[in-house]
Each structure stands twice: as structure tokens, then as C-alpha cells.
């Protein structure tokens, strides 16, 4: 659906700024793809290159089979009809009602009046604002304003929805509601969603895959569970530690440092179906080792369960080798602490 090849974006001036530095990505049709990074990482520039709002210095951007950097202004306008966009600060027209805001892109597109009315009411029902059709933005909460922004963005049936920090101005409860709505829209309409954010919650709750940006570059990319359960880049580890703490408490580390030949402290990481397996009981039953749980952390990445467990095992070397064999069979990753 979206292919980015060797993209570079440099802003001219007395001191040139390279906002995007040799980025290549492929975003699949129908997925929710997250791009996370700190302020100034290049996320917004990359997002704006996808709909042609920013012309790259070099590289290619393919959208739905079309290389958009070569398009004329008229061709680019036609392409943008396939792309909806929602913003951090809503960007609603204060002089228009909710209905009028959602109708605006359809009016510009020359849709017949009856078709506009029908479509606006459809999307307002989808976002849960049918009863607010005649209200003005000043009468709405932040979450309701963002729902209007989402309705406006999908009114013309786009294939792609670009989301620029859509929850950063919202409280935690409203953030959860907006994320749930975006996931529902993705499932019901099959729209490909690209969402940039600096909030880990956005990535862990709704994204299928993620790219981590730092200083204009993509430093890690992949399935959310793979990237965030096994991060290697320092910036990724910083983000992960805000929601998935893999830093063991000092008392556990101190305990692990008191070495004995008949015991080991292991850090186990597992995800998916393995997270629901009786791993500990199987180890004890099949190996005869004594096992103590020192630390644990469980949760979900989107709809995938994960677990992190620090355990201490007591037994001879042969039994401990059998423990490792079982963990390998179950695809549980282990690290000796």
C-alpha cells in the first residue's frame, strides 16, 4: 500500500536540517502501522511526505502503486482523495457545525447534496456523534472534537488514514476511547492507518507493526511484539521501559549475584500462546528442579499476551540443561541474570 525508498528530507536555510535520513519502509494494506520517536525525530516530516505535503530531497514514495514525488499538483490533489488525515489539535472550522465540518471535504469534492447528507450521517453514527450534528466545536469536549476530525477524515472513503499525534492533547480515558475507535474503523472499513506518536500506549494498544525513529532515521522496525519484547536500540529501550519494565529490582539483582554452583537466576520472556502455557509447572514436573519466582510482569501488546518472569532454579547441571531444553521447545527466550 505504501512503500518508502531511501527517503531524505532536508530543510534549507543557514543551517540545513536533515529531518528524514535515508528511510525505507513498507506499510501493508489494511494494517495499523505506528511510527514512534521523540520530538524532532522526523516523524511528522515522514508522515507529510506520504500525502505530498512535503517534497523529499531524494528518494521515492509509492502510495497505492503510484510514485507520488513525480506527480503534478493536479495529480497530487486527486491522490489525496484516497488519503484522510487527523491532527493533534483537531483543526475544525469554528464557524461550522459538526455536520458542516464533516461535510466540508465532500463539498470540495463536488459530491451531490443528498449524497453528502447520507454520508455525513453514516460517519457521525460510526464515531458516536449522531446527536451532535448541529453542535458547534466550542460546545464539544476534546474527545468529541477528535471524533469529528476522524469522521471528516473518513467521509470521502479514503484507503489510507494518516494520524498526526491524535491523542497527545487528550486525557488517558479519552485516549483509550479514541484508540478503540480507530481500531474499529480499521476493522470495519479496512482502512490502512499510519499513526505517529511519542506515546507508547498508542503503539501497544492498536498497532500491528512499528518503526522507531531517532534523529531522522528508522533505528528499529517490525511486529510490535518482536520489537518491544526484544529491543536493542537505546531509544527503543527507553520507550519500552515506560510500559514494560524489564529492569529487575535491585534486590533481585543482588540475590542473583550471590552465585552458587547448584542454582541459576533466569529471566524469561514469552509472548502469544506461550504466555498462557503452564511453563513453571511443566518445568518442575519434568525436571525435578526447585523453582522460585522472584519477579513477574504480564500484559498485552494489542491483543497478544506477553510475560516477563525472573525465576531461580535449584538443581544439578543436567536438570538445569533440561530446563533450557523445555524453554527452547516452548519458544521462551531466556537470559541468565
Swiss-Prot record:
Disulfide bonds: none
EC number: 7.4.2.11
Keyword line: Amino-acid transport, ATP-binding, Cell membrane, Membrane, Nucleotide-binding, Translocase, Transport
Highest taxon of source: Bacteria
Subcellular location: Cell membrane
Pfam family, one: ABC_tran
Domain ABC transporter: residue ranges: 4-240
Membrane topology, as annotated: Peripheral membrane protein
Reactions accelerated catalytically: L-methionine(out) + ATP + H2O = L-methionine(in) + ADP + phosphate + H(+); D-methionine(out) + ATP + H2O = D-methionine(in) + ADP + phosphate + H(+)
Positions contributing to ATP binding: 37-44
InterPro entries to which the protein is assigned, alphabetical: AAA+_ATPase (IPR003593), ABC_transporter-like_ATP-bd (IPR003439), ABC_transporter-like_CS (IPR017871), ACT-like_dom_sf (IPR045865), MetN_ABC (IPR041701), MetN_ABC_transporter-like (IPR050086), NIL_domain (IPR018449), P-loop_NTPase (IPR027417)
This protein's GO CC annotations: plasma membrane
GO molecular function, one term: ATP hydrolysis activity
UniProt family annotation: Belongs to the ABC transporter superfamily. Methionine importer (TC 3.A.1.24) family.
Role played: Part of the ABC transporter complex MetNIQ involved in methionine import. Responsible for energy coupling to the transport system.
PANTHER family: AMINO ACID IMPORT ATP-BINDING PROTEIN (PTHR43166), METHIONINE IMPORT ATP-BINDING PROTEIN METN (PTHR43166:SF30)
Subunit structure as annotated in this protein's UniProt entry: The complex is composed of two ATP-binding proteins (MetN), two transmembrane proteins (MetI) and a solute-binding protein (MetQ).
UniProt name for this protein: Methionine import ATP-binding protein MetN
Organism whose genome encodes this protein: Carboxydothermus hydrogenoformans (strain ATCC BAA-161 / DSM 6008 / Z-2901)
Amino acid at each position: 500500500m505504501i512503500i518508502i525508498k531511501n527517503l531524505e528530507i532536508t530543510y534549507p536555510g543557514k543551517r540545513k536540517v536533515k529531518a528524514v535520513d535515508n528511510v525505507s519502509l513498507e506499510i501493508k494494506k489494511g494494517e495499523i502501522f505506528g511510527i514512534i520517536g521523540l520530538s524532532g525525530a522526523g516523524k511528522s516530516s515522514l508522515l507529510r511526505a506520504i500525502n505530498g505535503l512535503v517534497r523529499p530531497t531524494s528518494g521515492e514514495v509509492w502510495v497505492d502503486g503510484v510514485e507520488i514525488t513525480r506527480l503534478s499538483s493536479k495529480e497530487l490533489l486527486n491522490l489525496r482523495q484516497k488519503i484522510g488525515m487527523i491532527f493533534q489539535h483537531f483543526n475544525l472550522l469554528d464557524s461550522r457545525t459538526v455536520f458542516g465540518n464533516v461535510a466540508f471535504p465532500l463539498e470540495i469534492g463536488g459530491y451531490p447534496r443528498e449524497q453528502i447528507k447520507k454520508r455525513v450521517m453514516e460517519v457521525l453514527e460510526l464515531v458516536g456523534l449522531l446527536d451532535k450534528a448541529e453542535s458547534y466545536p466550542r460546545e464539544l469536549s476534546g474527545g468529541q472534537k477528535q471524533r469529528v476530525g476522524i469522521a471528516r477524515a473518513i467521509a470521502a472513503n479514503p484507503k489510507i488514514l494518516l494520524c498526526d499525534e491524535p491523542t497527545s492533547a487528550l486525557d488517558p480515558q479519552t485516549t483509550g476511547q479514541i484508540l478503540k475507535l480507530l481500531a474499529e474503523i480499521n476493522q470495519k472499513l479496512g482502512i490502512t492507518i499510519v499513526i505517529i506518536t511519542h506515546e507508547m500506549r498508542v503503539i501497544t494498544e492498536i498497532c500491528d507493526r512499528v518503526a522507531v525513529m531517532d534523529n531522522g532515521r528508522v533505528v528499529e522496525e517490525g511486529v510490535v511484539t518482536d520489537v518491544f519484547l526484544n529491543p536493542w536500540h537505546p531509544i527503543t529501550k527507553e520507550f519500552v521501559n515506560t510500559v514494560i519494565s524489564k529492569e529487575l529490582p535491585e534486590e533481585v539483582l543482588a540475590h542473583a549475584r550471590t552465585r552458587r554452583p547448584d542454582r541459576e537466576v533466569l529471566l524469561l520472556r514469552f509472548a502469544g500462546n506461550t504466555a498462557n502455557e503452564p511453563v513453571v509447572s511443566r518445568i518442575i514436573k519434568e525436571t525435578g528442579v526447585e523453582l522460585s519466582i522472584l519477579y513477574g510482569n504480564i500484559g498485552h501488546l494489542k491483543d497478544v499476551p506477553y510475560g516477563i518472569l525472573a525465576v531461580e532454579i535449584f538443581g544439578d547441571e543436567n536438570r538445569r540443561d533440561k530446563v533450557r531444553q523445555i524453554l527452547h521447545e516452548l519458544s521462551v527466550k531466556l537470559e541468565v541474570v
